[in-house]
């Protein structure tokens, strides 16, 4: 983009709690004379929004946040990527591996149980794990999934422990994750269990078990916010990058663990369908939902006689109360342009079992 090192200021190790984020944002705006400021952690949002209100001539952009739509602050913006697309594609690779294991007699169809290590029982995690499961199930219909939550975005010991429990206690034969350390991949390598990771390849930590990984690529968003700021053009209030915009990427497939040529061909086919809009990850015909309002299970959902979703009141404004129906044209519109960029799919669909829950706090 032609920026010099002096034009890019990076501040690290900013905690989510306390006033550190606000202080850093004010310093960047007031003292460093930055024109656009980007924060990358969910807990930074309230402090970044506070700074945005005080410096209206500076653009403030926040990854994974939920407040831009309702805050009404013109220089405050949220951004996310449709990582559920990448997780779905990675799930297809997992399903192909399960089919290989069934064909080789290593497991029966009923034993195609996926384990998933999640950080928190939040929409972001639930959306990702569900899209991964739906991808696997699209090619391995007998697949089911069990989930254990650690209560932390990054805790290698807890993540390894959760993955080990999924393998040993819950009889899971393939593991994936929405947690940030090498805990789950390490457990898989030690136990010889196939693994699909997240946020980058973990091949070096699991050469005998790693299959593929999906990740968010923020470069297209950085380019957009810089170019728009330079041109004096508006930055979208809610921006969502996709596979088509190269904002969602996948690693290479480990051909030592899964049939590489056929797997890559199938993944490319699915990516083409996503790009063409002929495949919707959360097509309501591809999953069923049990509603048990008494026990607060999917209470915001309405389903038909076949348990297919017909309406879902999602929490778009971030107040933990469903307010907007996001089901239309036969699919759940996750991270929709007219809603918000951050995920709001928090339905526990049939076929997925939470071994525990952890909402933080």
Tell me what each language-model feature is.
Residues 1-361:
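A residue-level marker of the well-folded mature domains of exported/periplasmic proteins
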């Amino acid at each position: 983009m032609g920026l010099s090192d002096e034009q890019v200021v990076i501040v690290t190790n900013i905690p989510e709690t306390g006033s550190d984020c606000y202080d850093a944002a004010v310093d960047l705006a007031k003292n460093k004379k930055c024109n656009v400021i980007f924060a990358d952690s969910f807990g930074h949002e309230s402090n970044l929004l506070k700074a945005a209100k005080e410096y209206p001539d500076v653009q403030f952009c926040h990854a994974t946040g939920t407040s831009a739509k309702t805050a009404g602050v013109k220089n405050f913006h949220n951004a996310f990527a449709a990582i559920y697309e990448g997780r779905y594609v990675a799930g297809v690779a997992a399903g192909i591996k399960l089919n290989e294991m069934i064909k080789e007699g290593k497991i029966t169809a009923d034993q195609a149980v996926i384990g998933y290590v999640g950080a928190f029982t939040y929409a972001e995690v639930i959306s990702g794990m569900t899209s991964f499961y739906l991808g696997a199930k699209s090619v391995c219909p007998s697949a089911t999934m069990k989930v254990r939550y650690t209560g932390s975005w990054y805790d290698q010991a807890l993540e390894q422990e959760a993955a080990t429990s999924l393998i040993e206690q819950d009889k899971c034969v393939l593991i994936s994750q929405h947690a940030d350390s090498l805990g789950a991949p390490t457990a898989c390598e030690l136990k010889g269990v196939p693994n699909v990771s997240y946020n980058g390849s973990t091949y070096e930590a699991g050469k005998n078990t790693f299959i593929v990984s999906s990740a968010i690529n923020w470069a297209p968003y950085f380019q957009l916010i810089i170019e728009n700021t330079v041109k004096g053009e508006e930055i979208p209030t809610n921006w969502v990058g996709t596979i088509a915009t190269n904002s969602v990427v996948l690693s290479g497939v480990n051909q030592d663990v899964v049939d590489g040529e056929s797997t890559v061909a199938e993944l490319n086919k699915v990516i083409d369908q996503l790009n063409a809009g002929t495949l919707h990850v959360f097509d309501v015909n591809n999953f069923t939902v049990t509603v048990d309002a008494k026990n607060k299970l999917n209470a915001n959902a309405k389903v038909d006689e076949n348990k297919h979703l017909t309406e879902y009141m999602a929490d778009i404004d971030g107040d933990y109360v469903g307010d907007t129906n996001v089901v239309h044209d036969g699919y759940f519109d996750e991270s929709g342009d007219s809603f918000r960029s951050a995920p709001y799919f928090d339905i526990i669909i049939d076929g997925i079992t939470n071994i525990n829950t952890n909402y933080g706090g």
